[in-house]
Design a protein with these regions (language model features):
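Short glycine-rich phosphate-binding loop at a beta-alpha junction
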Residues: 62-75
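Conserved hydrophobic/aromatic pocket- or pore-lining residues that grip, position, or stack substrates
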Residues: 27, 69, 97
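Glycine-centered small-residue hotspots that permit tight backbone geometry or close packing
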Residues: 44, 70-71, 106-110
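Cofactor-binding active-site loop characterized by glycine-rich and histidine/acidic residues
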Residues: 78
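Active-site-facing substrate-recognition patch
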Residues: 1-63, 120
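Short, glycine/charge-rich flexible loops or terminal/linker lids adjacent to PRPP-binding catalytic cores
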Residues: 81-125
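Fold-independent oxyanion-binding glycine-rich loops
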Residues: 36-37, 72-73, 100-103
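Structural motif
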Residues: 70, 125-127
Length: 127
């Protein structure tokens, strides 16, 4: 079984991927729905990171690498963290990661971007 097939089975087992008659916010009809809010455990987060890492690793080998992983707020934040950890653990690649805030803070770290800095020359993977 490929990691893609295993990932689909994992989403179904986790109650994240469901099948039926759904209508999206835009009014489009779809036979399936993905609700990532149904991931709720550390084991699921770890597995999710492993699936993302497998895909990213495969794609980056073909593309010649990357400099940074970016996870857009809000749902991309746990994805980028678990993917970066899994890439290091499973493949020995230690990517910097970064994510954004949707709102600026007036105390502490006031920036909108947190984590590794994004430089002009960086090749960035957006998760």
């Amino acid at each position: 079984m490929t990691y893609q097939e295993a990932f689909i089975e994992f989403m179904v087992r986790s109650g994240v991927l469901t099948f039926g008659d759904f209508t999206t916010k835009s009014g489009r009809k779809t036979p399936y729905f993905i609700n990532t809010g149904n991931y709720k455990t550390g084991a699921q987060a770890s597995a999710l990171g492993d699936y993302y890492a497998a895909c990213i690793h495969e794609q980056l080998e073909e593309a010649g690498g990357a400099d940074l992983l970016f996870g857009p707020a809000y749902k991309g934040i746990p994805l980028v963290v678990t993917a970066a950890a899994s890439l290091y653990r499973n493949y020995g690649t230690d990517y910097a990661y970064c994510f954004n805030r949707k709102e600026a803070k007036d105390h502490g770290d006031k920036g909108l971007l947190l984590g590794g800095p994004i430089l002009d020359k960086d090749r960035v993977v957006i998760i």
